[in-house]
Amino acid sequence: MLAIASSVANATAADLPHFYGDAPDEHHPWAVHDGNRPQPPIVVPGTFSTQEQPGKPPSDAVILFDGTDLSKWEADNGPAGTPTKWVIKNGAMECVPGSGYIRTRDKFGDIQLHVEWASPTKVEGESQGRGNSGVFLLGLVEIQVLDNYHNPTYADGMAAAVYGQHAPLANALRPPGEFQSYDIAFRRPIYRDGREVDPGYVTVFENGVLVEDHALIEGETGHMRRAKPMHFPDAGPLKLQDHGNPVRYRNIWYRPLPPRESEGGTDGALTVEDTKAKRAELAASIRDDAQKLANPANPLPEMFRLAESLVYAQDDATSQKVQQMAAAYVDTLEGMPPDQRAQKKDEARHVREVFNYLVRFKVFPDTFAPRQKLQQIIKSQNWDKK
């Protein structure tokens, strides 16, 4: 990465702004390879499960069931707080047929969800009557749980189907009695003022195999009926279905997903209005940061930072100050004794790169005087000669 650096002993390239990739535009508040873009949080990965032992969740996961208690769950067929009749056996929660659905006490929206489940070892029934349950996202969108190991049924009702809407891309089930894993990325449909502003999608991996690829959520799932568009809530519980079979679950956890562009996220292409607002916010933050770098003995760090703010949003006072600082820098360089000026070769070439960047992305015009004068100095000193 090209970073603009000064010759000051206490400043490094990493301390100074980067003038590198394409500048922000009307739909992207960040520059390409933007040094101001926040670093992603560090997450310690978990471990994979075996049949004998559930894996360890990642460090930022919210644990919904760890094999020891049902304190985060309640019955779905009663008032809030009604205890479930599901039971815990050997580190797994087991559906008691006829007891009703179970749901989380908490509600959440867009998530990465991990669920492990096992149908009974003893095979009983066929088609939809064999090891049937379901994982309901927001309590509305069912990812089918079913023992389809050598057990055909209608495709949009097989294990890992978005029930009644999308058949799985593959049948990657293990034999009955063994634990299966679902890893789900769920993005709910987003509604504002009664209108859908962002569709919902779900991606599912079954035992590590991609079986739902960014499948469009057409509405609430249901049996024998076509899904219809509907207003989705921003948050809802996770539900597990009682379909009359003693299906077991273990190692259930989720990670909240970051907001999308339509709800304030800043990754991807934003609206013109949202981009403008974010760029103004970034420019103001960078200007505030520049104030901390003010140092008459070494003005370059402050000048670079102020100049960088102009890449995000124009500000007349800041533009004027950068032009004054740039002119002062070039005048000082020109007036130095030859031996002292020679020591500024690398620094001057870096400053020229900044000026070129600012001109290239229309922060300053082609006639930007400090740039022209600096180029003349560099040429007269043969500093571009290799």
Model-predicted segments: where are they?
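Bacterial N-terminal signal peptides
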Residues: 1-7
